Amino acid sequence: MRLDKFLCDALGATRKEATKILKSGEVTVNEQVQKSGAVKVTEECVVEWQGRELAMQGPRYIMLYKPEGFVCSHEDGFNHTAFVLLDEVKMDELHFAGRLDVDTTGLVLITDDGKWSHRITSPKHKCDKTYRVWLADPIGSDYAEKLAEGVQLRNEKELTLPAQMTIVNADENEVLLTIHEGKYHQVKRMFAALGNKVEQLHRERIGAIELDESLEPGEYRYLTQEEIDSVWK
């Protein structure tokens, strides 16, 4: 691929803008400054601009540790969008593969691959999602059984699919809940149906993809190939 085409793809630049960037002398290929757009680059080449390594633009698969106070949308008139936490080009092409409420923290997956995200969000695939939940009131002795049978959500005709709950810390009213669907505010509504209230909610896992323990709130990384492939299994 020509270097100017590579820059257009990697930076979302026009051909004219790519030419201007090259003339600035801020682009290196394998640590050598290159000003010609005709230079050929391959997958083995290391291309940098202003000291930042650029990648050949293919589908992107991102894991974000969403902090509280950010919404999963491109625009919101009242809250920060989680996209401001990303340092990426062509942001308008990215979307969330499953959202979290503004006050919910944890794992969010972001991509520009619609087929991949559909595999996660489509109800027919029943993608597992695991949440750490802190409740306002003590954990009922019958909660696990009722959730495993399915509960009746307000304004819903059907029971929820069977969910798995385990107690993490009874003194702190802390549980882990795994669900297999993604209804609006589902976890909060499930515990409301049991007469309790969710005080704090944190998503730890989507399918086989677990939130990286090394990430701090607001940080992100690209998924490994194994994590990407796990969605199709």
From Swiss-Prot:
UniProtKB keywords: Isomerase, RNA-binding, rRNA processing
Domain S4 RNA-binding: 1-67
Active site residues of this protein: 101
EC number: 5.4.99.19
GO molecular function: 16S rRNA pseudouridine(516) synthase activity; RNA binding
InterPro entries membership: PsdUridine_s_RsuA/RluB/E/F_cat, PsdUridine_synth_cat_dom_sf, PsdUridine_synth_RsuA/RluA, PsdUridine_synth_RsuA/RluB/E/F, PsdUridine_synth_RsuA/RluB_CS, RsuA_PseudoU_synthase, S4_RNA-bd, S4_RNA-bd_sf
One GO BP: enzyme-directed rRNA pseudouridine synthesis
Enzyme class: isomerase
Record's catalysed reaction(s): uridine(516) in 16S rRNA = pseudouridine(516) in 16S rRNA
PANTHER family: PSEUDOURIDINE SYNTHASE (PTHR47683:SF4), PSEUDOURIDINE SYNTHASE FAMILY PROTEIN-RELATED (PTHR47683)
Cited function: Responsible for synthesis of pseudouridine from uracil-516 in 16S ribosomal RNA.
Family per record: Belongs to the pseudouridine synthase RsuA family.
Name assigned to this protein: Ribosomal small subunit pseudouridine synthase A
Gene name of the encoded protein: rsuA
